[in-house]
Amino acid sequence: MTHFIKGQWHTGKGHDVASSNPANGEIIWRGQTATAEQVNAAVDAAREAQFDWFILGFDARLKIVEAYRSQLEANKAELAETIAQETGKPQWETATEVAAMIGKIGLSASAYNKRTGTETNDTPAGRAVLRHKPHGVVAVFGPYNFPGHLPNGHIVPALLAGNSVVFKPSELTPKVAELMVTLWEKSGLPAGVLNLVQGEVDTGKALASHPQLDGLFFTGSSRTGHLLHQQYAGHPGKILALEMGGNNPLIIKGVADIKAAVHDILQSAYISSGQRCTCARRLYVEQGEQGDALVAKLVEAVKQIKVGPWNAQPQPFMGSMISEAAAKGMVAAQANLLSLGGVPLVELMHLQAGTGLVSPGLIDVTAVSELPDEEYFGPLLQLVRYSDFDQAIKLANQTRYGLSAGILADSREDYEYFLARIRAGIVNWNKQITGASGAAPFGGVGASGNHRASAFYAADYCAYPVASVEADAVSLPATLSPGLTLS
């Protein structure tokens, strides 16, 4: 059964689809896409259930969400294995994804109270009360790279705020979505509060364009996000939250511990096979002996990165990319950089036909006069050698994106200089730029989003403020306004 609508599982009425383990091509899930009629039924179910869910109150909603957390805890091994099978990521990494999903419950409850709770103040005009109310029915579009954690980061705060949800996962990770929704079902969520529709572009279009949606929360490619933004233009009454990745820079300046710096570069560029929106795509290293030494150590370390299937022993650092098509896309991206004058220090290789397994790549693009401003979503790092710190920052800012950026530098003064000038929503110092705290906002500027930061600030786009001035009874003021007479 592929779709979950109004508390019931349904077979899709569209065409057959399947998902496979990208490391070996094994089919691990089959189903049928949702038709426009089924999408409509899911939205109708969400609309019907939404007010009763809201009127339960926060404490009752939280109790059910905490029951979901218990389900995640009880099923974390199965969920981690399912994510690993369907995405190709190593199991050590998917275990951390499930842990983040579990942690999201407490963080979201805290964010609800701190960002969108209730506040009362006595004023001369009366009692001023600030409350927050849910938007209504929202769609959540999930990505394939974190098929559990990222949609979970929208769904949990949306439900806590009192919204109902229609969830459309990536067509590449339907099995993970099905398991997630099964755990929500076991948590006692009322029918219609969370609905699941699986499918490809047509299903997504039917949901995104549905007139009864009050909002849409999206994590994915810049191209799709920009199309959604255009589609929602002229609809100011609908909330749209977009997270669309980045062409993220990492600058190295004056670092004594080269080994530690190389480690942070590897974690920034190659974790998740480079399939994190915060991954470093561009690396800026000083010219000179120290920079030469760092590059030499980096080349050696990149060549030694272990790549393999999700369940390989000993465990690899990098698993498979999401698909063979994604792997071929990275080979093509590398070829383009080389054609522009890039020099391969470590060549990215497609390791096995029919799979998404690739080795990591490192390309020196210092001689390339105009780098393509593209998010190469895979383990391909572009190296630029620089002679001037201001030049490095200027080059780092030459992108339409603005998600994450970082600097590895022993000098705090260098960091503060960089922090004041770099344009990004996540800026790290002496830490991998793929590291972000769930207790902080997560989002970027420029083409990386639309100023709707998620993580701790997801509460902000899940509810709207309602300001009230109140009194327990109607009463006359001590003095009437000029020109008024009441007899």
From Swiss-Prot:
Q: What is its EC number?
A: 1.2.1.71
| Claim: Membrane is one of the keywords in the record | no
Q: In which pathway does it act?
A: Amino-acid degradation; L-arginine degradation via AST pathway; L-glutamate and succinate from L-arginine: step 4/5
Give the positions the UniProt entry annotates as the active site.
243, 277
Top class in the EC scheme: oxidoreductase
Q: Which molecular function GO terms apply here? A: succinylglutamate-semialdehyde dehydrogenase activity
> Could you give a single Gene Ontology term from the biological process aspect?
arginine catabolic process to glutamate
Q: Name one Pfam family in it.
A: Aldedh
- Quote the catalytic activity from the record: N-succinyl-L-glutamate 5-semialdehyde + NAD(+) + H2O = N-succinyl-L-glutamate + NADH + 2 H(+)
The residues the record assigns to binding NAD(+) are 220-225
InterPro entries per UniProt: Ald_DH/histidinol_DH, Ald_DH_C, Ald_DH_CS_CYS, Ald_DH_CS_GLU, Ald_DH_N, Aldehyde_DH_dom, SuccinylGlu_semiald_DH_AstD
Spell out the PROSITE patterns in the cross-references: ALDEHYDE_DEHYDR_CYS (PS00070), ALDEHYDE_DEHYDR_GLU (PS00687)
* HAMAP family the record matches: Aldedh_AstD
What is this protein's name?
Answer: N-succinylglutamate 5-semialdehyde dehydrogenase
